[in-house]
Amino acid sequence: MFGSDLYIALVLGVTLSLIFTERTGILPAGLVVPGYLALVFNQPVFMLVVLFISILTYVIVTYGVSRFMILYGRRKFAATLITGICLKLLFDYCYPVMPFEIFEFRGIGVIVPGLIANTIQRQGLPLTIGTTILLSGATFAIMNIYYLF
């Protein structure tokens, strides 16, 4: 998926996330995350790496950084994003297996683990991961139907 497919997947993911959030009150790890993960839904290794970094970010911020700093609101969100970005960059540096097709998604992919970790802090792990995978799969399925026509 290149070019306009990126925009279509992100807009579709945001739309599905917004509808789902309005209906259920459950936020699927931020509005842009399901659209982004739908772009790599057929690459389970990449999805697992993003989820692993997200959980690691949550653990570091909740049980590490918050012991030394008072974190709430914007400070907590900023700490989560910075930790997620640093872990993603460190992981990319230490484990540089990145297929060419998803290279262009690295920019937005740096933010996604922090967004997922921030939502895990608010809603819990099972609810966040479950709804995110559900909506990513729905976005992926709709994009595949879009490709047929």
UniProtKB/Swiss-Prot annotation:
Its main location: membrane. One of its GO terms (biological process) is capsule polysaccharide biosynthetic process. It comes from the Bacteria. The keyword Methyltransferase does not apply. Keywords: Capsule biogenesis/degradation, Cell membrane, Membrane, Plasmid, Transmembrane, Transmembrane helix, Virulence. It is found in: Cell membrane. Essential for the synthesis of the polyglutamate capsule of B.anthracis which is one of the principal virulence factors during anthrax infection. May form a polyglutamyl synthetase complex together with proteins CapA and CapB. CapC may be the endogenous acceptor of glutamyl residues. This is Capsule biosynthesis protein CapC. It comes from Bacillus anthracis.
